[in-house]
């Protein structure tokens, strides 16, 4: 199915090169690990090959963010290149401007840049604020503005899951 979608995309667009993106690669079940190793090693699923000119790119979250994460064995690690990505407010602000995120979100982060990205665990469980939360909040604020609906701390707290930031 995955390989077929690549061939479908090539047929639809006429493109001969592309990126096959696989998300949450480190959440693959133990039973699928050999298949994933074959995929990374040979660029095949079963007898179906990824077309020449296509690159495989995968992403996964660290174990502290996702309880389903499995560590790769040495054989698999030897076939991938790891690039750690850190939150970067300046880069995200460029994205926010380009995608016209709600001005209140942009203004808030200009005043309180330390609130951009936070992840903490305490007795009440995880408290977090991520780039995705800011973008989702922006969409909700835009909808509330258009529909003339009130915005309060409870609503904001659904997107910014850290009490200090949601206030």
Which residues does each predicted region cover?
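AAA+ P-loop NTPase catalytic core and its hallmark functional loops
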Residues: 1-111
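Conserved AAA+ ATPase small/helical "lid" subdomain
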Residues: 93-160
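C-terminal engagement/docking regions of AAA+ P-loop ATPases
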Residues: 166-167
């Amino acid at each position: 199915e995955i390989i077929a979608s690549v061939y479908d995309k090539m047929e639809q667009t006429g493109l001969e090169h592309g990126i096959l993106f696989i998300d949450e690669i480190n959440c693959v079940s133990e039973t699928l690990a050999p298949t994933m190793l074959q995929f990374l090693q040979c660029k095949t699923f079963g007898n179906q090959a990824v077309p020449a000119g296509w690159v495989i790119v995968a992403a996964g979250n660290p174990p502290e963010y996702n309880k389903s994460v499995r560590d790769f064995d040495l054989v698999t690690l030897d076939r991938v290149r790891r690039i750690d990505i850190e939150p970067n407010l300046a880069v995200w602000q460029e994205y926010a401007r380009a995608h016209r995120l709600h001005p209140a979100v942009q203004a808030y982060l200009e005043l309180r840049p330390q609130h951009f990205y936070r992840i903490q665990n305490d007795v009440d469980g995880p408290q977090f604020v991520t780039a995705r939360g800011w973008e989702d909040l922006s969409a909700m604020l835009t909808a509330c503005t258009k529909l003339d609906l009130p915005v309060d701390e409870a609503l904001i707290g659904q997107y910014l899951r850290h009490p200090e930031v949601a206030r």
